[in-house]
Amino acid sequence: MLDRMPDAVAVHRLSRRIAAPCILASVLALLVFAGAAAGSPARSDATRAVPTIAGMDDAARWTAAYWIGRAPEADRPLATPDAIARQNARLLREDPSMHALAALGPELQGAQVRGWIEAVSRRPAAARFDASGRRLAPRSLDRLIDALALDTIPARQTTRYGLVVRRAALRTFPTDQRVFSTPGDTDIDRFQESALFPGTPVVIAHASRDGRWLFVVSQRYAAWIDTRDVAEGDAGTVLAYGARAPYRLVTGAAVHTAFTPEAPAVSAVQLDMGTRVPLAVAPAQGPLNGQHPASGHAVELPVRDGAGRLVLHPALLPRSADTADGPLPLTRRHLIGQAFKFLGERYGWGHDYNARDCSGFVSEVYASMGLVLPRNTGDQAGSPVLAVDRLGDAVRRDVAMGALEVGDLVYVPGHVMMVIGHADGEPFVIHDIHGGGQRGTGGDVVRLGLNGVVVTSLRGLVFDDGTPYVDRATAIVRPADVR
């Protein structure tokens, strides 16, 4: 997920996972002229001039074509599909942040389930505030802990499986209440962990005391999900769904199934980049959900029946939607092109705001080429499987920065950026960030408030205290260097 940042720019560690969302994004200023009763009108934050992003005056640099044109051997595959598949399999076996659902067996042990929950659902040590700015009282936190129903976890239980039926939030606690670190600053919900997309297989490990929430384990994350967002099915059907062929892979930022009043459960369903959906077993010979099927791909989507059980229902995915019949080749052209499909999207901590954060952004870009990454920045940068260059002193960092290639992932505390090339002798990156700053003409720190997917110079970025991002770089991951 994100990657949990503490209340400012620091990194908060949760058991095996380092959460630390990203820190940047695009803010287009709204000019609002306030009427004045007497004298000059006061200028609010919304009416102040937006700083120019250093190195981005040339409009061409905001296009994928510019960077693709500068990329060496833009169409040369950087890894074969077989090599990528082998690395994905290794990641599932050897990376402790990943969960091999098929290997969990027919029974779950109570200690294992309790460990999963307690790794995520920890009582906050710092103050938390609700949307109105009121501090959460101890009794409110007590209720959240009680809702976990840890006392009801059996010593052993039959392993249950399900498929996610719609884009769904993963939560720290079984609640949809939004909580924040600072009164009035409601952009980052500290109870938001991540999100799962339709068709994601999960193991259903536990239920909240009121039954409205399920604790689920997916391949890349474990947390609480609304019960209504999961359809329970048998292990064979659930685990086979994502491996079925032929299929369509979403290669756009997001696509939607065709609107259909005849089948509301599969109408206008959002499918984000990297989502894989199998084609319908028996393509429709007549109308499909009230529409001729020739103009779309007939796919099968998971839905819940009245009892919450899994049913696979046909849906139409328009041929105009940005999808493919398999992963795109892992090339510099596609790395840049796929990343730019998110340009300008608002930053969303833990996939909030129907968007994504820094680690989610790079994960979805690589997923469109068939390559799996761990969910959080800490797990990505610390993976025992990926090609990771852990940076040390300044000399080593400078050497590494000079050797950056398209697709490399650069990590600083709480954030990850993807290299898209060089200009003016400097590396440039595309990233999904919440804040971000740079030096002004007088040497002072200028806060950019990027708050979305943007392109910036790597060396030009500074933290609030003026320290350059590159001086705090901790690791470089080259996902295309498959092992």
What are these regions (language model features)?
Residues 166-170, 174-187, 248-262, 387-395:
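Short, structured beta-strand/loop micro-motifs enriched in basic residues and often containing a Trp
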Residues 42-61, 220, 228-249, 254-258, ...:
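Aromatic- and glycine-rich peptidoglycan recognition patches
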Residues 41-168, 217-249, 285-287, 291-336:
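Boundary regions of SH3-family modules and the immediately adjacent low-complexity/disordered segments
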Residues 22-32:
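Bacterial N-terminal signal peptides
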Residues 185-208, 265-289:
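Conserved beta-strand/loop element in small beta-rich adapter and peptidoglycan-binding domains
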Residues 195, 373-440:
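...with weaker cross-activation on analogous glycine-rich loops/strands in unrelated enzymes
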Residues 186-189, 264, 321-326, 344-353:
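Second-shell loop/turn segments in exported
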Residues 335, 339, 349-369, 373-377:
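Active-site nucleophilic cysteine motif
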